[in-house]
Swiss-Prot record:
Interacts with glycoprotein L (gL); this interaction is necessary for the correct processing and cell surface expression of gH. The heterodimer gH/gL seems to interact with gB trimers during fusion. Interacts with host integrins ITGAV/ITGB3 to mediate viral entry into epithelial cells. It comes from Human herpesvirus 2 (strain HG52). The chain crosses the membrane at residues 804-824. Residues 21-803 are virion surface. Belongs to the herpesviridae glycoprotein H family. Residues 825-838 are intravirion. Disulfide bonds join C258-C429. N-glycosylated, O-glycosylated, and sialylated. This is Envelope glycoprotein H.
């Protein structure tokens, strides 16, 4: 090409396989000669309009073949968007020395024209590239046409056109975290390295997994090669357009989000790109590269200096972290602090479990906030911990070339739990909009794994009856997250919840970690159908009963004990040897329809049960309120209520009400009781007597109708007999409340044994969940909408008859019978005689 022409060719690189070649950075000295000309490349300095190239007319018989393809729809409006790439074409920009007065020509050449063409004999022969001993770079920034005087104005970053992704460079250049890696501790000061496979340990193919492998998942190792994604070439594009594309060897990614937030993490060899965006806060981006790499910021085309490096903390022994975001100390100090902490996470551990344990603790340790509102700082921290967990999991699996089965199932299960908690509890998302996509497994291998696990789900529930086996089956269904898996385990999960309720009524405390874990996954299985759309009638009925049982399991004593258990568990957790797994501390309150656990009465009850501690009282009270708020946010599913308790959200014409439900009791398949602090305009309403006037309580029986009227609660003394006959209470709900307006228990009378337990009252030495030493009022809520104030059960004695009296009575009956027989005989004899005489 002659000296009078300048040619700029851009080749966009996508995902490709193979490890034989990679990107290498080459500097054209011509670029440097023209740096001073960049400031002159504005076509119209008055309006700041970007320079636009000319394109051939597709109808031109000579040059139409070089016109932009029709699918790009390039116009003067779309050309500045830089969407020039078409998969079937290469584009070439030809300009002259008169640039920018001559805007140049943007030409498109089909790739098919370039394939298989013979070499031009007039061109000098290129030397063959010999083999190189240098391994391919893990991370290479593709600066492309940076500071090219012929293209920098055209390819000017949108970050300099519309916004700057790092407005406060000094604010985003902060010191390294306290737990970050050092030369002495290159994997983090508090790192607990994940175990590797012992020498000689076999690697099991996923197609051969059995129930025995599931029971011994902690010593069952799978081959990473073939199960994980094979590293492939990939170009990471920063959404902020503040840095140039980065070439990496991708190993997968993790994404989760909802209607109010989105998190995307891209993993690679020595690389992680994390983007966090929310509806209620500006976006943030974290980029992790090897310690010896730098990422240049896309500079102003008129700047003659070399581009600046992206902000972030100083490099560590293994990685360097760059930060892009808008928060500044002046306007959002908490968000900036959260971003600083997120930037330190990738260097603090190589063990995925440590990150997940810390994420659970972050969720429970956050200040209560206000209801279900979004809290960006908490969401950023949870997203950073979850993304760093995936980064550590993938890196450890590739380093060991093996994956422990328990780690694989644990990572997938806890990722789903944490994504849901972060989305609903921190981002304010609608529950039915939450999604999670973990793409670190090879797609074909994942299908084989899911098929095998789906087979084992049905087998383990069919062949084994232990609680451990059933909890494992429910966890597998939760990991698979498919309608088929949920349908296979849902009947078993419903029976398990009923069985645990029977044990609870018998006085057993459901506090063992295995019981809590089984209850966690069982309730998750029953709630799952509402995420897939409208549940069937069977699914709705099963879920309604499950919600009713978990609400019954959540008494005031259970709620207070849950606070104490969570505080104690968090206090002894160091996230190294002692990890915190939330399913092992699960409370039925978190899956119930009780939304009153953050009220003052429950907080005082929880503090009363607190053991002696050096923690200041105000700090303990704040922690308790935080845990109570978490339980409420965890359980508060507006979408779930609409799906399974639609009568509670039924819309009627006329004035609406803002009464927030405190407790929901789905007592039949189409009717529910709701407890509120203000009366509702529809349904059968009852005002509870003897309650503090500052916190009144109302109970309303709701159906799908819009009529409403009030009734009085009638006090009654019920009668029980000593022959244990049916009392007509099966299906009713026993509700106990205090004068302070605290509902202590909402217990379902589900069987004859339960109604007999209620009627008989407390027995010495045997716990009875229906009784209470606290001054309170007991109500019975019946399925037909009737509510009575239960005063007591009166015993109706059975009359005692002496044996002698029975013998005399029998003799009297015999004598009377004989007399009647004699009289009848006389009548039969006399009547014919008198008839003949007449």
């Amino acid at each position: 090409m002659g000296p009078g022409l300048w040619v700029v060719m851009g080749v966009l690189v996508g995902v490709a396989g193979g490890h034989d070649t990679y990107w290498t950075e080459q500097i054209d000295p011509w670029f440097l000669h023209g740096l001073g000309l960049a400031r002159t490349y504005w076509r119209d300095t008055n309006t700041g309009r970007l320079w636009l190239p000319n394109t051939p007319d597709a109808s031109d018989p000579q040059r139409g073949r070089l016109a932009p393809p029709g699918e790009l729809n390039l116009t003067t409006a779309s050309v500045p968007m830089l969407r020039w790439y078409a998969e079937r074409f290469c584009f070439v920009l030809v300009t002259t020395a008169e640039f920018p007065r001559d805007p140049g020509q943007l030409l498109y050449i089909p790739k098919t024209y370039l394939l298989g063409r013979p070499r031009n004999a007039s061109l000098p022969e290129l030397p063959e590239a010999g083999p190189t001993s240098r391994p391919p770079a893990e991370v290479t920034q593709l600066k492309g046409l940076s500071h090219n005087p012929g293209a920098s104005a055209l390819l000017r970053s949108r970050a300099w056109v519309t916004f700057a992704a790092a407005p406060d460079r000094e604010g985003l250049t902060f010191p390294r975290g306290d737990d970050g890696a050092t030369e002495r501790h290159p994997d983090g000061r508090r790192n607990a390295p994940p175990p590797g496979p012992p020498a000689g340990t076999p690697r099991h193919p996923t197609t051969n997994l059995s129930i025995a492998h599931l029971h011994n998942a902690s010593v069952t190792w799978l081959a990473a090669r073939g199960l994980l994604r094979t590293p492939g070439r990939y170009v990471y594009l920063s959404p902020s357009a503040s840095t140039w594309p980065v070439g990496v060897w991708t190993t997968g990614g993790l994404a989760f989000g909802c209607d109010a937030a989105l998190v995307r993490a891209r993993y690679g060899k020595g690389f992680m790109g994390l983007v966090i965006s929310m509806r209620d806060s500006p976006p943030a981006e974290i980029i992790v590269v090897p310690a010896d790499k730098t990422l240049a910021r896309v500079g102003n085309p008129t700047d003659e200096n070399a581009p600046a490096v992206l902000p972030g903390p100083p490099a560590g022994p293994r990685y360097r972290v760059f930060v892009l975001g808008a928060p500044t100390p002046a306007d959002n100090g908490s968000a900036l602090d959260a971003l600083r902490r997120v930037a330190g996470y990738p260097e603090e551990s190589t063990n995925y479990a440590q990150y997940m344990s810390r994420a659970y603790a972050e969720f429970l340790g956050e200040d209560p906030g206000s209801g279900t509102d979004a809290r960006p700082s908490l969401f950023w921290r949870l997203a950073g911990l979850l993304a760093s967990s995936g980064f550590a999991f993938v890196n450890a699996a590739h380093a060991h070339d093996a994956i422990r089965l328990s780690d694989l199932l644990g990572f997938l299960a806890h990722s789903r739990v944490l994504a849901g908690l972060a989305a609903r509890g921190a981002a304010g998302c609608a529950a039915d909009s939450v999604f999670l996509n973990v793409s670190v497994l090879d797609p074909a291998a994942r299908l084989r794994l899911e098929a095998r696990l789906g087979h084992l789900v049905a087998a383990i529930l069919e062949r084994e009856q232990s609680l451990v086996a059933h909890a494992l089956g429910y966890q597998l269904a939760f990991v698979l997250d498919s309608p088929a898996a949920y349908g296979a385990v849902a009947p078993s999960a419903a029976r398990l919840i009923d069985a645990l309720y029977a044990e609870f009524l018998g006085g057993r405390a459901l506090t063992a970690p295995m019981v809590r874990r089984a209850l966690f996954y069982a309730t998750a299985v029953l709630r799952a159908p509402f995420l897939a759309g409208a549940p069937s009638a069977e699914q709705r009925e099963r879920a309604r009963r499950g919600l009713l049982i978990t609400t019954a399991l959540c008494t005031s004593d259970v709620a207070a004990a849950t606070h104490a258990d969570l505080r104690a568990a968090l206090a002894r957790t160091d996230h190294q040897k002692n990890l915190f797994w939330l399913p092992d501390h699960f409370s039925p309150c978190a899956a119930s329809l009780r939304f009153d656990l953050a009220e003052g009465g429950f907080i005082l009850d929880a503090l009363a049960m607190a053991t002696r501690s050096d923690i200041p009282a105000d700090v303990m009270a704040q922690q308790t309120r935080g845990v109570a708020s978490v339980l409420t946010r965890w359980a508060h599913y507006n979408a779930l209520i609409r799906a399974f308790v639609p009568e509670a959200t039924h819309q009627c014409s006329g004035p609406s009400h803002n009464a927030e439900p405190r407790i929901l009791v789905p007592i039949t398949h189409n009717a529910s009781y709701v407890v509120t602090h203000t009366p509702l305009p529809r349904g059968i309403g009852y005002k509870l007597t003897g309650v503090d006037v500052r916190r009144p309580l109302f109970i309303t029986y709701l159906t799908a109708t819009c009529e409403g009227h009030a009734r009085e609660i009638e006090p009654k003394r019920l009668v029980r007999t000593e022959n244990r006959r049916d009392l007509g209470l099966v299906g009713a709900v026993f509700l106990r409340y205090t004068p302070a307006g605290e509902v202590m228990s909402v217990l379902l009378v589900d069987t004859d044994a339960t109604q007999q337990q209620l009627a008989q009252g407390p027995v010495a030495g045997t716990p009875n969940v229906f009784s209470s030493d606290v001054p309170s009022v007991a109500l019975l809520l019946f399925p037909n909408g009737t509510v009575i104030h239960l005063l007591a059960f009166d015993t109706l004695p059975i009359a005692t008859i002496a044996p002698g009296f029975l013998a005399a009575s029998a003799l009297g009956v015999v004598m009377i019978t004989a007399a009647l027989a004699g009289i009848l005989r006389v009548v039969r004899t006399c009547v014919p005689f008198l008839w003949r005489r007449e």
